[in-house]
């Protein structure tokens, strides 16, 4: 499948975005992902927030012209199995993407990505990361039933593959608006470090309490780089997704999208 018509360089970020990126990190206590039903209703300004335990909360808003929530669900179902598709999203930072499960036979977009593990390699700032992104049912983030025609929520747990440590949670909450949709992206970094190995997990629990050590790995720079990365990839996605979805995302063209 030829994707060349959808490939384009990143556009410069708007003045409002660069203003948000220039803000200092704000000291603030925040709720964990299980309270997402409350969090998405709050008027939280874009930026980076840090609590007293050196955990981070990142908020990023993207206005997506002519993009509807169902297109976002389709995008996550469609792009995950293929590195070239993944690179469309951020042509500079995204390197590779693969799945170990094949759900291409399913026609419901949510069923094609919820419950799977996506293995990606990408840059966040100058940091090269190998990550496993485990997509979860929004109910696990405390979100109730969503009307696919009005809203959607992409929820995931992120594991660093070099260490096996679960380091972050993410939520992309998308709602219809007058121009298309509004995406509110939230990231929680370091608030609940976990490992599948019980011994290592016990160490992580102790390690997390030593805040200055935790700050050596999860810090202001990483959080601010993540904010910039999210602004770039989501604004870029909005620039080509309407045309991509029109060409291959509709039900009449489903076979071509696999």
Give the location of each predicted region:
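Beta-strand-rich recognition/accessory modules
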Residues: 150-162, 170, 182-190
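A generic short-segment signal for beta-strand/edge and adjacent turn/coil regions
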Residues: 24-32, 56-58, 137-144, 150-156, ...
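Broad, structure-driven detector of short, well-ordered beta-strand segments within folded domains
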Residues: 133-136, 169-176
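Short, surface-exposed coil-to-beta transition loops
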Residues: 57-59, 165-171
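A short, structured loop/turn motif at beta-sheet edges
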Residues: 66, 143-149, 173-182
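Glycine-rich portal/gate segments that line the openings of hydrophobic small-molecule binding cavities
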Residues: 94-165
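Terminal "cap-and-tail" regions of soluble proteins that handle hydrophobic small molecules
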Residues: 1-52, 173-258
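Hydrophobic ligand-binding cavity/cleft-lining segments
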Residues: 5-8, 12-110
